[in-house]
């Protein structure tokens, strides 16, 4: 079949001259498609004697296979060339720095809580937590707060019903701890508290941390020394600190603690006092044997003083321009 060899030669030439995969596909259809030149060669077999057809068919099939192999090889070459060209256009300089992702930062109130927990942790205090939905006994009664106290009024407290409320202080955590644990006790209780108030210096929800020590021979001197050290550590200054006599139902004697501000004025930072004997009795601790001190402070208040923030509400408005200053 001299004509067959000529067809294969032409097919090879067309394959080599194809400059892209699309042109190569046209060559395949021309020679190997249903009406391709080599495919039609099979129709000539009917003109041959029966005994010659198998050999002739084998020759045609081999020719078709040779052309298919040439097509496959050329296709691989063209695809590699196209890939290399595309990669050359999309060259990446691997020495360039990657895209940086802006790191987040801790909220300033969280920073304050962490800082205080670290300080008192080094003094042996444990961090304890409690429920934010509290009962009136742990929030008021056990803390020696009488039924007529204004803190119980609806305009100050969020009540669910006559017995349940959103806690107004974390002092309930102290009561729950003393109910379960006998002295010595040394804890701090951070957490969210709720009061019905909203203005430049008050929000309905804020963060508070209270501390408690109960042991033998605990005195007001221990309280003063602890808080002196804490405030100087927290503000990183040798601050002037004063204790003013005050009143809290759950401590006796009680005091409010002030620090001298940069403007020469005293700034209130926390309240404290010796645990009231009635509170100890309410949790089954003998006040003739044990004594203790407690203190409480607002985290937002301390954060405002530390960072010079003038509006408490800024902590809850999620303004990134404000929050990024503390990263």
Curated annotation (Swiss-Prot):
Q: Which residues bind Mg(2+)?
A: 252
The note describing how and how many cofactors are bound reads: Binds 2 magnesium ions per tetramer.
The chemistry this enzyme catalyses reads: tRNA(Phe) + L-phenylalanine + ATP = L-phenylalanyl-tRNA(Phe) + AMP + diphosphate + H(+)
Highest taxon of the lineage: Bacteria
Q: Which UniProt keywords apply?
A: Aminoacyl-tRNA synthetase, ATP-binding, Cytoplasm, Ligase, Magnesium, Metal-binding, Nucleotide-binding, Protein biosynthesis
Enzyme Commission (EC) number: 6.1.1.20
Database matches in SUPFAM superfamilies:
Class II aaRS and biotin synthetases, tRNA-binding arm
Cellular location(s): Cytoplasm
- State if Cytoplasm is listed as a keyword: yes
Instruction: Name what cofactor the protein needs.
Output: Mg(2+)
Which top EC class is given?
Answer: ligase
Which InterPro entries does the annotation name? aa-tRNA-synth_II, aa-tRNA-synth_II/BPL/LPL, Phe-tRNA-synth_IIc_asu, Phe-tRNA_ligase_II_N, Phe_tRNA_ligase_alpha1_bac, Phenylalanyl-tRNA_Synthase, tRNA-bd_arm
Q: Which residues form the signal peptide?
A: none
Quaternary structure annotation from Swiss-Prot or TrEMBL: Tetramer of two alpha and two beta subunits.
Family in the record: Belongs to the class-II aminoacyl-tRNA synthetase family. Phe-tRNA synthetase alpha subunit type 1 subfamily.
What is the protein's given name?
Answer: Phenylalanine--tRNA ligase alpha subunit
Q: What is the species of this protein?
A: Pectobacterium atrosepticum (strain SCRI 1043 / ATCC BAA-672) (Erwinia carotovora subsp. atroseptica)
Q: Which gene encodes it?
A: pheS
């Amino acid at each position: 079949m001299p004509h067959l060899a000529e067809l294969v030669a032409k097919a090879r030439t067309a394959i080599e001259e194809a400059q892209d995969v699309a042109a190569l596909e046209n060559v395949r259809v021309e020679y190997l498609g249903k009406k391709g030149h080599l495919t039609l060669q099979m129709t000539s077999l009917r003109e041959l004697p029966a005994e010659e057809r198998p050999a002739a068919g084998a020759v045609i099939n081999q020719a078709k296979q040779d052309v298919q192999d040439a097509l496959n090889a050329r296709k691989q070459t063209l695809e590699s060339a196209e890939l290399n060209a595309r990669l050359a256009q999309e060259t990446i300089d691997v020495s360039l720095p990657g895209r940086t992702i802006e790191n987040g930062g801790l909220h300033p109130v969280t920073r304050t809580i962490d800082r205080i927990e670290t300080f008192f942790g080094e003094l042996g205090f444990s961090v304890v937590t409690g429920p934010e939905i509290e009962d009136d006994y742990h929030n008021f009664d056990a803390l020696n707060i009488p039924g007529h106290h204004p803190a119980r009024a609806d305009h100050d407290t969020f009540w669910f019903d006559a017995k349940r409320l959103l806690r107004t202080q974390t002092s309930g955590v102290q009561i729950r701890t003393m109910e379960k644990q006998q002295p010595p006790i040394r804890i701090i209780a951070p957490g969210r508290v709720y009061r019905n108030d909203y203005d430049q210096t008050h929000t309905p929800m804020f963060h508070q941390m209270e501390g408690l020590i109960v042991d033998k021979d605990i005195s007001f001197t221990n309280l003063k020394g602890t808080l002196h050290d804490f405030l100087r550590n927290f503000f990183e200054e040798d601050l002037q600190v004063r204790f003013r006599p005050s009143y809290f139902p759950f401590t006796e004697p009680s005091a409010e603690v002030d620090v001298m501000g940069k403007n020469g004025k005293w700034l209130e930072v926390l309240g404290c006092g010796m645990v009231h004997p009635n509170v100890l009795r309410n949790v089954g601790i003998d006040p003739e044997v044990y004594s203790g001190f407690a203190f409480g402070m607002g985290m937002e208040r301390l954060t405002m003083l530390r960072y010079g923030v003038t509006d408490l509400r800024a902590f809850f408005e999620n303004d990134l321009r404000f929050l990024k200053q503390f990263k």
